[in-house]
A protein has these predicted regions:
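Alpha-helix N-cap/loop-to-helix initiation residues
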Residues: 18, 75, 137-140, 164, ...
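Phosphate-bearing ligand-interacting subdomains
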Residues: 111-173, 201, 209
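Segments forming oxygen-rich coordination pockets for charged ligands
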Residues: 1-111, 125-129, 207-248
Length: 248
């Protein structure tokens, strides 16, 4: 079915779809786990990527989730924009009044931070982006240290280049490696040095969405495959960047 934009949609009607497979797919996605469904040439569905000749495999990925820890206009502006974009957003705020403002904006998950030594339990997953906007050294170090031990695909912290360099140095003095602190993005945003809270929110959210789409499209982009082969005039070891395939 061609579309005016130049794309197309293929429609496949399965009159006797296995409801159990669809329920299992839904439940796995609801638990924040990626899942695949395989459609055989006979029209039957199977859960998972099944190596069946002629079959097609469709992968479904958990939606982007955003966790923001901070205070002030930067945190609220980003949370408001992300929520309006349909992104599941969690706010961790130090100020009780700001927490009430966030709830009035329609943000359901709002936690008030008390002391750096008693952080909320980490529940990030590989589809979670974390942004720090605290502007306090003690809180900054503790929150980033917690995020770094988790699986979030994006960790960002608001601040200048000099501020970012200092925060990474502090984290390294408490045991994190340079490779680990390299996960932290700073300064954040596609457009550098944004001062207005709303403009900064647009810049940061665009960077987060870009990182999420890159993870979805190229899930093995950071994985390497070492191929050892005895081939004349070719070095023994070659390093290839892995890619994904949608055909079963």
């Amino acid at each position: 079915m061609p579309l005016p934009c130049g794309g197309a949609i293929d429609v496949c009607v399965l009159p006797n779809t296995q409801a159990s497979v669809l329920r299992a797919c839904h439940d796995q996605l609801a638990s924040r786990q990626p899942v695949s469904i395989t459609l055989s040439d006979s029209g039957s569905l199977g859960l998972g990527h099944l190596p069946t000749p002629g079959a097609l495999s469709f992968q479904y990925i958990p939606k982007l989730r955003l966790r923001i820890a901070g205070r002030g206009a930067d945190s609220l502006a980003l949370a408001r924009l992300a929520t309006a974009s349909g992104i599941h957003t969690e706010l961790q705020l130090r100020d009780a009044a700001e927490a009430q403002d966030a709830q009035r904006l329609g943000i359901e998950r709002v936690t008030t931070l008390t002391v750096p030594s008693a952080l909320p339990k980490l529940d990030d997953d590989p589809w979670t982006a974390f942004l720090l906007a605290v502007h306090d050294v003690d809180w900054e170090e503790t929150l980033l240290a917690q995020a770094l031990i988790g699986p979030a695909f994006y960790i960002g912290a608001i601040g200048s280049k000099a501020t970012h360099a200092r925060r990474c140095e502090r984290l390294q003095t408490i045991g994190f490696t340079k490779r680990q602190t390299h996960r932290i993005r700073g300064p954040v945003g596609l457009i550098p040095s944004m001062r207005d809270a709303s403009s900064l929110a647009v810049s940061v959210l665009a960077e987060i969405v870009e990182a999420y789409q890159r993870k979805v499209r190229y899930p093995l982009s950071s994985t390497a495959l070492a191929l050892l082969a005895d081939m004349p005039n070719v070095p023994d070891t070659h390093l290839f960047q892995s890619s994904s395939c949608t055909n079963a």
